[in-house]
Amino acid sequence: MAGTEAASGSQTATISTEHTLTTITTAGVYMLRVDVNALANGDRLVLRAKAKARTGDTTRQVFSAVFEHTQADKVVDSIPVPIVHELVWTLQQTAGTGRAFPWSVLAL
């Protein structure tokens, strides 16, 4: 079965602000893809996935990845994250100049 795009957009980062890219409530396995071509030396980007263990639980971090400076790979993928209740993808730039990051969430 081929993957489909569950959500997409572009986020211009405000330094130190954690931006919510999308919240998914349909059970499945999802992966975040982000174009990091805009990163420059001195920039630091954090991508996070947060999920609930059960319906009424608090959403908590299940994955994070940090990218610093110019990247050799201009598009980066998260690990696949299976969910039943809720999945929240966030982007936070913690250093450098705020950049615009095109992104897509793929349903696998």
Model-derived segments and spans:
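Noncatalytic modules at the cell exterior or secretory-pathway interfaces
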Residues: 27-34, 79-101
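Surface-exposed ligand/attachment interfaces on beta-rich extracellular proteins
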Residues: 1-26, 38-43, 58, 71-75, ...
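Short, surface-exposed beta-strand/strand-loop-strand elements in extracellular ectodomains
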Residues: 42-55
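Acidic/polar N-terminal loop/beta-strand segments that form early-domain functional surfaces
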Residues: 35-37, 52
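Acidic Ser/Thr/Pro-rich low-complexity disordered segments
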Residues: 53-63
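Low-complexity intrinsically disordered segments
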Residues: 104-108
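An anionic, turn-rich surface loop/hairpin at beta-sheet edges
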Residues: 62-79
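Low-complexity, flexible helical/coil segments
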Residues: 38, 68-71, 83-88
